[in-house]
Amino acid sequence: MGSSFGDLFRISTFGESHGGGVGVILEGCPPRLAIDVDAIQAELDRRRPGQSKITTPRNEVDQVEILSGLVDNKTLGTPISMVVRNKDFRPNDYGEMQNIFRPSHADGTYHLKYGVQAASGGGRASARETIGRVAAGAIAKQLLRKVNQTEVLAWVKRIHTIEADVDPNSVQIKDIESNIVRCPDPKIAKLMVERIEEVSRDGDSCGGVIECIVRNPPAGLGMPVFDKLEADLAKALMSLPASKGFEIGSGFSGTFLKGSEHNDAFIPSGKGILRTATNNSGGIQGGISNGELIVLRVAFKPTATIRKDQKTVDSDGKERTLSAKGRHDPCVLPRAVPMVESMVALVLADHLLRQQGQCGLWQ
């Protein structure tokens, strides 16, 4: 019913922003996989609110509790359940918004669909729902690393009109985590922070683009026709809060090229190995990974909840003016980086198991 994702490596998330807690049940993880629990917590710390001056001041520890599925930090092959308790929530900040719809937020459409909505904290539409995704994604990352030394890295490419030109082939995690905006170019990162602070002082918000790569992805992942790898990646990433666009490889810029310019020529690399001279395909051809670097980008809109006066309506359809209260990110992108990585890792882990299930007998 909309809260589960994946086929064989499957997650189901639960909880609301201002409820008792949020979490995930992960099914299908292979048994006997050694899990670094500290690495799960480290990923949640990257997503955590209150981590810097450009994120929401909501102060949550986001300490993960693993309730099942592990013994001595090894997977049992049974469902892994993880939960994070909500501590610092203030429902009174949302009293005015109980019956007033925030423009471009999920309040209005949730009310249309269900006849009721959790206005306090945004309920299931809150980014706190992604805690479960990030926790499960941390396990997916460890599985991918164990099987194929696969690495998933994302960074902030653009904030509003400020864009960084980052070489996907050379970017490293230490460069991404060297500043609070998670842009590996330190000079551009400084400008991005200044822009976020500027819009925040004005009671406004801004969006941008996150770029993500997969190094050393297993070749052969993805299935024709409706389960193409990029199709599942698009669904995964477009399910994230505030996401508004997805592209892979050359993306929309590829439409300006001719076929002779865009085609990735194959180069001799030995039997059973495909290598290309260029990578306009972004590591996926015909919906199946070819082993080259997977390169994708996700666009995120400006945060919907802002402190400026906005015209809106209430649940009775009457015109109202709303200046939202509560604690919100002026820009979601710095905290969305681990969310993007997690969803990509979950898709790859799922397709890895599906590939083994269908084709593993002959490999």
Curated annotation (Swiss-Prot):
User: What terms describe the molecular function in GO for this protein?
Assistant: chorismate synthase activity; FMN binding
| Keyword Flavoprotein belongs to the record | yes
Q: Supply one GO BP term.
A: amino acid biosynthetic process
The protein's matches in Gene3D superfamilies, at most eight in alphabetical order, are given as: Chorismate synthase AroC
Signal sequence region: none
Annotated FMN binding sites: R124, A125, S126, G286, K301, P302, T303, A304, T305, R327
Enumerate the InterPro entries for this protein: Chorismate_synth, Chorismate_synth_AroC_sf, Chorismate_synthase_CS
Describe its function.
This reaction introduces a second double bond into the aromatic ring system.
The name this protein carries in UniProt is Chorismate synthase
